[in-house]
Amino acid sequence: MAYQKVECQFNGQTLTLETGKMARQADGAVVVSFGGTKVLCTAVSAKQMREGQSFFPLTVNYQEKFYAGGKIPGSFFRRERGATERETLVCRLIDRPLRPLFPKGYMFETQIMPTVISVDEQNDPDTLAMVGASAAIAVSDIPFDGPVAAVRVGRVEGNLIANPTIEQRAESDMDIIVSGSRDAIIMVEGETRFISEQEMLDALFFAHEAIQPLIDVQLELVKIAGKEKREFSVPEIDPAVVEKVAELAETRLSEAVKIRTKQDRYAAVAEIKTEILETLAADFEDQEDDISEAFGNLQKRLVRQMVARDKVRIDGRDKNTIRPITCEIGLLPRAHGSALFTRGETQALVAAALGTSKDEQRMDNVQSMEFKKFMLHYNFPPFCVGETSMRLFPGRREIGHGMLAERSIAQVLPNHDDFPYTLRVVSDILESNGSSSMASVCGASLALMDAGVPVSEAVAGIAMGLIKEGDDIVVLSDILGDEDHLGDMDFKVTGTREGITALQMDIKIKGVSKEIMQQALEQAREGRLHILDKMAEAITAPRSDLSPYAPRITTIQVKPDQVRTVIGPGGKNVRGIIEATGCAIDIEDDGRINIASADGDACKAAIKMIRNLTQEAVVGKLYMATVKKIMEFGAFVEIFPGTEGLVHISELAKERVKKVTDILQEGDQVLVKCLDIDRQGKIKLSRKEALGQSLPEEG
């Protein structure tokens, strides 16, 4: 394969696609470069399909090499470990727009591997990996209805920006990744700070316009370096099987799919399917897979026709109606906050825990190292759908759903300086029939308010769907699991009464117009407000106090140059305070000190010890001092821990003193008065001026 290179101008910089130099034995390999960031993207697809394969085994493995940023991994073996949370999330971003563009019936094992091999401090490699992955498939012989491209959209001072730099992202009120083809938006993922539905719509179509040059440059590369696409055959279902299944099952199945409860509906459908398989086994020997596929296709067609044409949903609702909602809080007495959110047959048990800076999660990646102060973890155990399976670790779906909920809630959390807690929220899905991630958002909002976390507003989430049959189009609010599986769009929107905080969208078909998206966003807003009203019946504002089991964090401020004094040599002073009081103490370089303890008295004791270490002498004030060292010319005394001053021999008594030891001995307690503090900070003290006086009583 000859080396080929194409370029385009994007956002004031040059984006480059190269092929034919690296990874030449892959079916497709492209290096995408932008600024100092480079991503090597490879695509390989098996030449033979596994026997009995019934789904498309696509795997995306995105990896950030630490050498790309001139770093060495911090792990014990100094190697990159398994996929980080960030890498897992980027894998999903790449997978979701690519998967629907492979031909129907293509079930050959396919692996996409974007590898970050160089990274600068301004250009995030995630959207570049999305472009490079599409380009690698496009130039390969793998069948593909692409290319697609992706951009990140930010907004600074009201101006939309495509692929903002990391500096610009820090100032932006939105962070959205949009992926699309030449004609349509396919995938959206991101977070915003309370923007309106119209502003969101404008951002989406701004992004679609921005990706066009990235589509063009891929097509240019395909033109000069693309391979001829391989041919493959799709096994077709025997038409006789399709006809017989419809004849035997259509009437009964039409009624079964209208059963409103999920388990009863599934049982009825399974019973019909079993009977059909048994009935047709003799006439269509060894065609069980065809019979099952024909039955599934029939079920899909019946449900879609029922919703799109008859305007009747599986559970009897109209397109706008939200399932019945119940909200309970404070169920778990020892969790710092808890909620049980139930919407129809979807239920989330959500708990919140408050911790200190020691509980922050260290996030070490190729571009930076951060400490995460808010985490939301989503768990989807098999029992929530009445199944069994081995679960050891959260899967990609669970990590993705948890991050969507985390982004949704993060916008309403208090500033860390005002509320210096580390927060962890866990959502355990107890029942699932669609929209479990949105139930997690609602439950998390309730649990945090129950915990007394001063969130600015409640947050709710809703999943929207779309079914398009010819000219019949229906946008559905609060979709069921079957409506998600059998529909054409999954559009999750979260937000407050003020605006949108996060969204996630996957579109499976072409031709979803701006008007349809506008309708979906408006319908989602109406649904979100309804859900917020239901949540307000349980709690309207954060509790005024934290759980008695939560740590109390008190923040005090000392001068930055006093931090060393508080810490002490080798950490001696701060360790002593921790051992004496049992408090957790976190000291910032700017002099901010957080003291955490569930015991209020212990916290007060720690504060007093720190104040003793950092207090400064005041001219004219009396101190009870300890004699530390006797000299011929006077005595050095400690007026408080770490601070000493000199009592000159002439200041020991009103009469003349010949020897210091006539008045003082080392270890004596003596009342002194501060006379002066010179420019070097030396403290001049007097015993003579303190005679006849006493310390004021502590109030």
UniProtKB/Swiss-Prot annotation:
Chief location bin: cytoplasm
User: According to its UniProt record, which cofactors does this protein need?
Assistant: Mg(2+)
Give the EC number(s) under which this enzyme is classified: 2.7.7.8
Q: Which reaction equation describes what this protein catalyses? A: RNA(n+1) + phosphate = RNA(n) + a ribonucleoside 5'-diphosphate
List UniProt keywords, sorted A-Z.
Cytoplasm, Magnesium, Metal-binding, Nucleotidyltransferase, RNA-binding, Transferase
All residue ranges annotated as the S1 motif domain in the record = 620-688
Q: Which GO terms describe its cellular component?
A: cytosol
Q: What is this protein called in UniProt?
A: Polyribonucleotide nucleotidyltransferase
Record organism: Syntrophotalea carbinolica (strain DSM 2380 / NBRC 103641 / GraBd1) (Pelobacter carbinolicus)
Q: Which gene encodes it?
A: pnp
